[in-house]
Amino acid sequence: MRYNGPTAAVRDQFHQGTNRRAYEMLGAHPVTQDGQEMWHFAVWAPNARAVSLIGEFNQWDKEKTPMQKVYDGTWEVRLPAETFDVKSDPKRYDYPDAAKKLTTYKYCIQAQDGTWQDKADPYGFAMQMRPDTASRIYDLSGYRWGDADWMEARKSYDPYHSPVNIYEMHLGSWRRHKDGTFLTYTEIAEQLVPYLKEMGYTHVEFMPVMEHPLDMSWGYQVSGYYAATARFGEPKELMALIDALHQAGIGVLLDWVPAHFPRDAMGLRRFDGTPCYEHPDPRRGDMPQWGTHMFDYARGEVNSFMLSNACFWLEWYHADGLRVDAVTSMLMYDFCREPGQWLPNKYGGHENLDAIAFLRRMNETVYRDFPGVMMVAEESSAYPMVTRPIYLGGLGFGFKWNMGWMNDMLAYIKLDPVYRKYHHDKLTFSLMYAFSENYILPFSHDEVVHGKHSMLDKQPGDLWKKFAGLRALYGYTMAHPGKKLLFMGGEFGHFIEWKYDDQLDWFLLLYENHPQVQQCCKRLNEIYRTTPALYQIDDSWDGFQWIQANDSDNSIVAFLRTDKRGNSLLCVTNFTPVFHPQYRIGLPQMGTLTECFNTDRKEYGGSNQYNNWAIRTEEEQLQDFQYSCDICVPPLATVYFTYQRDPLPEKAKKARVIPEIADVPPKKASKTAKNPQPLPEKSAGKANSISIG
């Protein structure tokens, strides 16, 4: 990335909060001056008395490289590139290689009270590995991308009516070396790409890859917003990881933290001796619950810093979207604060009008300049119109995590099945608001830590019931309206909670139950990806119809999902360990049901109760439906049926079936499934686990 110097208009945009490429005018950049290669450094420190550039190249001496103040509060200096070469005395720097670059630097800033403090570059493209905190000069240009086809296709990508199935992961704990050290970006690519492709995920979401000083923060307390973390290698190696995923047909979302930043002395806190990035009043500038500072979006320079950062990761790293963390804390001044601990806005309300304006500007800019990407809000309140267009008064996000659905579902599955009938509303209430936003259904990292138990261990009962309940939950989730997200380890039934400082327990795949649930997830992913009824209409009642919503006594729900061509899939879930060999359901039209997926099948570790033939409906009214039939409903299981409707008298064209997902070919039609007989076993051996290298 070459530096050409900002124009007056560009500087004005920076201060107004509309500059989306502020990283081109600030930070460290290679330049050419009179034929000589140089490095240009620029930092915004409007209230500083003096600023010096310090680093290995000048033995961290603040007297050697003073910077000059520009009229708008930035400080600049330009040095020959050879300044950063080890030349005459490599031993002086403890470097055995005389060609090594002296890349580390900081800004030494004098406050108005005369004190000095060393700060990392807010716009630095690389940083040292923790516990060291210096920035590193790094030229991002020169990487040769191989994902041109992906990037071109993304311009016309419509995620709202496409399958979106996200594998959320933490790069530092997915897998590690035997000695406990991190895999590099390159090593992660070698193992992750084939695994995700084999499992059938459409996207992967990386928890924050921006530099952060504390592993325990999981990356959510960022110190280097423009720097890929050095834990796993160089920035261009992260580019190569994303490139490899794109070439395999897998999208990449990045977690992004624009709400708050840590109080580390080397970071943004009181950057020039005064609050530059945070609000000066702690009632707005502090977040006591997290021990961090909140960004002050009333400042134009802060707006440009974060707007540019969002665009930076989409442009330079080819990210396919950002999952925006802690949006609720940005929207509300009273988030996690008691009365008296926050200041109202100018109208007396609790809404942060400046942050709301920033989010709208950011989404408008991103969707204009990067068509086909996904902007996802982690927003946990009932704030309206998060995913509605800005011109209608919305925030302009593409998707929002459905935290209400997630909390209800996890509370429900923790209950002993005996008591679930008293909480049946937790299964059905989500449809009261399911189409008010564009939702993602998240079983994320936050739900498998801090004593909440793993997805498997949340299930009550013995091991068989735990695994059966988990498979039933995954089957139900895949059919529920909304895009999907599952945190790593959940796909094979990780038994203990997630640990950020250790790899997943991959050895569990040596035990039969875990590869069986992994195979179940793989099959569900395949069905979801190839069945338009499950993803084409996630945003209206046109794609969903309750078949059985009120059977609380049996804790059974059933519903139809329908695609734009009228093809329907019936989902039936039994949340108790009671087997129902003849369960009567109503249907809106005469037709044929054919079981195409069943979490109770033997190959997934189930009891192998299923519907062995095509089932014809009968003209017998049940509830509000004129037609009905009996089906076999296994214990703690989800069953999918293709629903081939007979043509109505006024229709000349027969509705199509969904042939892509039929596991069991239709046999001789039977009116009921009163005496289901098991098919011959497909395999008597153990389930195969998915290889991860």
Where in this protein do the model-derived segments appear?
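Substrate-binding/active-site clefts of carbohydrate-active enzymes
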Residues: 128, 148-164, 170-350, 615, ...
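Conserved alpha/beta catalytic core and glycan-binding cleft of carbohydrate-active enzymes
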Residues: 318-320, 335-501, 529-600, 607-608
